[in-house]
């Protein structure tokens, strides 16, 4: 498969790229810096220069790949807005049967203490990630457009 990754130079992204390459996939990763370029190239991936706000770059990469794994974690209000714009763009440009992996985290379930929580649990995100629930719903809505979504 041809797979495009955002956040590929990060902690999780590096492991994901390494595993994808080990399994024989072509991988391209969005990068913002020379250091990130060196990191993803060192893993055998193609560097695609841009940021979460570079929707034209992300759109082209989405069209050129079979799957997109969105690992870039928003860290500011501007990043959160860019993440929402990326999801909106995906609804308009992702080819039929495109695979879109949108990563999340346990904090969308809130602080449950020692309780066991699974994916059927209601979302009660902590303030830091309160925006995530709406974004996850937006990602899941891509299924209606023929995109295969994993959150």
Language-model segment annotations:
Residues 34-92, 96:
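NAD(P)H-binding glycine-rich loop region in Rossmannoid oxidoreductase-like domains
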């Amino acid at each position: 498969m041809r797979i495009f990754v955002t956040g590929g130079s990060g902690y999780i992204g590096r492991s994901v790229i390494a595993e994808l390459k080990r399994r024989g996939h072509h991988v391209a990763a969005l990068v913002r810096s020379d250091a990130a370029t060196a990191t993803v190239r060192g893993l055998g991936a193609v560097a695609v220069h841009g940021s979460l706000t570079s929707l034209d770059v992300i759109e082209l990469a989405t069209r050129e790949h079979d799957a997109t794994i969105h690992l870039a974690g928003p860290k500011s209000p501007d990043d959160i807005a860019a993440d929402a714009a990326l999801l909106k763009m995906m609804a308009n440009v992702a080819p039929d049967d495109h695979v879109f992996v949108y990563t999340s985290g346990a904090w969308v379930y809130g602080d449950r203490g020692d309780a066991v929580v699974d994916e059927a649990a209601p979302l009660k995100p902590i303030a830091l990630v309160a925006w995530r629930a709406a974004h996850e719903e937006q990602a899941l809505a891509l299924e209606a457009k023929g995109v295969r979504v994993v959150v």
